[in-house]
From Swiss-Prot:
EC number(s) from the headed UniProt entry: 5.4.99.12
Gene that produces this protein: truA
Organism: Lactococcus lactis subsp. lactis (strain IL1403)
Protein name: tRNA pseudouridine synthase A
Disulfide bonds listed in the record: none
Residues forming the catalytic site: D53
CDD domains, per the entry: PseudoU_synth_EcTruA
Keyword annotations of the record: Isomerase, tRNA processing
Length: 253
């Protein structure tokens, strides 16, 4: 068996998330169908760097999988996967990795981006690719709130109640908001890991602060109290993208 690492992109609109689920269309199941075909119909189970929820997209999700036989030509394998997967999945790169390399458990950092349209009327052409908020937002307040998220914190207060992870301490290296134009914002979060719905809960809270319905100091209160009830609503999934996964062998993490 030979282990391969692949970088993939997908439009999450019509998926029930990344991870396999019974009677649901998922990214993992669609790719595994093609991998099994390429593996002489012997089942292949892939592993991802992490899950994304229904409606969430990815520019750079990373997976690994094992195929029997000799080492494949990497570009031919990438091309074979890319042309046989559905139109809402793209296989960007395939690499050879050691047999013990693991997409989830290798030390890595992740970058998420969140795109928000802020206008009186919503663009129908962006309804699957950006979230929407029609009310006024104070950019400076949102910048200040985002800066408070940087560093090592216990993010229990920004985690969905369904999280099964015991250790909720994570480090955020970058939390930034960029005004793309008069009607569009981009949020950037880069860290050593993120909890279930953490990014969307942070965005929902910052939006509420930007709309003057919470003080900037609410971020401190949420982090200190570890109480989800003090945070804002969970932001919509369509604005969220897994931008990049960087592993320790090619970064300074």
């Amino acid at each position: 068996m030979t282990r391969y690492k692949a970088t993939i992109a997908y439009d999450g609109t019509d998926f029930a998330g990344f991870q396999s689920q019974t009677n649901q269309r998922t990214v993992q199941k669609e790719i595994e169908k093609i991998l099994t075909k390429l593996n002489s119909f012997e089942p292949v189970i892939l592993q991802g760097s992490g899950r994304t929820d229904s409606g969430v997209h990815a520019f750079g999700q990373v997976i690994h999988f094992d195929l029997k036989g000799k080492v494949r030509d990497l570009e031919r394998l990438r091309f074979g996967l890319d042309t046989q997967t559905p139109a809402d999945i793209a296989v960007k790169k395939v690499e050879l990795v050691p047999d013990d390399w693991h997409a989830r458990y290798q030390k890595h950092e992740k970058t998420y981006e969140y795109y928000l349209e802020n206008s009186i009327t919503r663009s129908p052409f962006q309804r699957h690719s950006k979230a929407y908020f029609r009310y006024p937002l104070n950019f400076e307040r949102m910048q200040e709130a985002m800066s408070k998220l940087v560093g090592e914190h216990d993010f229990t207060g920004f985690t969905a109640s369904g999280s099964s992870v015991d250790d909720k301490v994570r480090t955020i290296y970058q939390a930034e908001i960029i005004r793309l134009d008069e009607e569009n914002f981009k949020f950037i979060f880069r860290g050593n890991g993120f909890l279930y719905k953490q990014v969307r809960n942070m965005v929902g809270t910052v939006i509420k602060i930007g709309n003057d319905r919470m003080p900037v100091s609410q971020i401190d209160k949420i982090l200190t109290s570890k109480n989800r009830d003090f945070a804002g609503p969970t932001a919509a999934p369509e604005g969220l993208y897994l931008k990049e996964v960087k592993y320790a062998e090619n970064t300074d993490i």
